[in-house]
Amino acid sequence: ASLNPKLDDGCGRFRVRHFGISLQSGFNSFTIIKQIREIVSQNSDIKVWNLSLGSNDEIRENFISVEGSLLDEIQFDNDVIFIIAGTNGIAPDGQRKKIGAPADSLNSIIVNSVDFSNQVVSYSREGVVLSFFIKPDVSYYGGGNGDFINVCEPLGIARVAGTSFAAPFIARKMAYLIHIMRLSREEAKAL
């Protein structure tokens, strides 16, 4: 049975490998990117990667973060695509907050959340990268505005909301297009 029957997309089930990146004291984003680079290079059969990480800080105008740039490099070097949660946050003045790194990666698909009425939720962030690339690339159901996504936790089912819960649904669709339909990364991304 499906945890979220309203979101059944007919893509079937996929085997998923989880790679934990330890967030011990003293870690930094460069350590995380180094670990991602190593994990991706050691798992060349995986072409679609879901990343749920991000900075609370907003991106700077006319710049791309080092993290976003390095993820773009990893994608190019390994012929993979990253699906990245668009980061959550609300600015103190109630305005929509700009995305945080690494959601400014140009070649990744950045995912934000909408509710079940297709309305953007309050915590979704947005931003223009290098004055030209508008992020997020796509939005999907991630809970919010009173709607929730069901997930499994150690103590049972929990009701949650966030871009980190919307991104895996897009990763599924990309995996279907690349691994089942045999489309290239570029073709799948264009769809």
Specify the residue positions occupied by each region the protein language model found.
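Polar, enzyme-active/binding microenvironments
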Residues: N56-E58, N62, D72-Q75, M181
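Catalytic-core regions built around general acid/base machinery
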Residues: V66-D79, A101
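Extracellular S/T/G-rich loop segment that most often corresponds to the catalytic His/Ser-adjacent loop
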Residues: K97-A175
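Solvent-exposed loop/turn segments at secondary-structure junctions
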Residues: L23-Q24, S55-E58, N88-P92, D115-N118, ...
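Subtilisin-like peptidase catalytic core
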Residues: A1-F63
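Subtilisin-like serine protease catalytic core
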Residues: A1-S29, D77-D79, S105-N107, V129-K135, ...
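Active-site neighborhood of phospho(di)ester-bond hydrolases with catalytic His/Asp-centered motifs
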Residues: N50-S52, F82-G89, V111-N112
